[in-house]
From Swiss-Prot:
Name used for this protein in its record: Sugar fermentation stimulation protein homolog
InterPro entries in UniProt: SfsA, SfsA_C, SfsA_N
One MF annotation (Gene Ontology) recorded for this entry: DNA binding
UniProt superkingdom: Bacteria
Organism placement in taxonomy: Bacteria, Pseudomonadati, Pseudomonadota, Gammaproteobacteria, Enterobacterales
Organism: Yersinia enterocolitica serotype O:8 / biotype 1B (strain NCTC 13174 / 8081)
A Pfam family of this chain: SfsA_N
Family statement: Belongs to the SfsA family.
CDD domains cross-referenced by the UniProt entry: SfsA-like_bacterial
Length: 241
């Protein structure tokens, strides 16, 4: 479990703007401008009036010491909007052998240069007498009809990562796309063809070439985030009712 220490503080969202900033109001009535690490569209994750939870850094050099971590929607779903947490959560779960599909490796390296397109892999797993395992981690927060979609905006970077993973398989390695589902309302995951058709096409190609796609949900609270159950990946765009 990833624990928030000190515990996150509550507030109410006023608005998100300039991608990286949000204004909130605390229970005491103080208006704060906080940092938002999520560069995506954040559809359904940033509705004015939602309850938000933020952390505070003790780094005196930070212009905005507070960071937006969680949202609780007005229907009760929890969302981790800090996309930087996805890599941390995946790495922690692998270190603790909680993801059976990714267990048995003796070395976990992070942010290693690889591929032909000047990329960095999120996680590289290695073990003696086993192929290298290249893992790209993506955060899923877009919810529509209990289905989580990725991406929530056109992502040329994400398209590049799929090409790189496919290349790793062609070179004899293992390659995994790990979807960290950080919205408690999501029950299944699909490629957002209606948002980024090229990404959906590349994902299908990558799977056919041998890239594995693994989706896991997480339990979210102001105390921390813990790995939950594996979730199904839909091969088409029709959510289960």
């Amino acid at each position: 479990m990833l624990s928030f220490n000190p515990r996150l503080q509550p507030a109410t969202l006023i608005k998100r703007y300039k991608r990286f900033l949000a204004d909130i109001v605390t229970p005491a009535g103080e208006v704060l401008t906080i940092h938002c690490a999520n560069t995506g569209a954040m559809t359904g994750c940033a509705t004015p009036g939602d309850a938000v939870w933020y952390s505070t850094s003790d780094n005196p050099k930070r212009k905005y010491p507070h960071s937006w971590e969680l949202t609780q929607t007005q229907i009760g779903d929890w969302i981790c909007v800090n996309t930087l947490r996805a890599n941390e959560l995946a790495s922690l779960a692998i270190d603790n052998n909680q993801i059976v599909e990714l267990s048995g490796y003796t070395s976990v390296k992070r942010e290693i240069k690889y591929g032909d397109e000047n990329s960095r892999i999120d996680l590289l797993l290695q073990a003696e007498n086993r192929s290298n395992c290249y893992i790209e981690v993506k955060s899923v927060t877009l919810l529509q009809q209990q289905c989580g979609y990725f991406p929530d905006a056109v992502t040329l970077r994400g398209q590049k990562h799929l090409r790189e993973l496919q290349s790793m398989v062609a070179n004899g390695h293992r390659a995994v796309l790990f979807f960290a589902v950080l919205h408690t309302g999501i029950r299944q995951v699909a490629a957002a063809r209606h948002i980024d058709n090229r990404y959906a096409e590349l994902l299908a190609q990558a799977q056919q070439a041998g890239v594995e796609v693994i989706c896991y949900g997480f339990q979210l609270s102001p105390d921390g985030i813990a790995l939950d159950a594996r979730l199904p990946l839909l091969l088409d765009e029709t959510p289960n009712s």
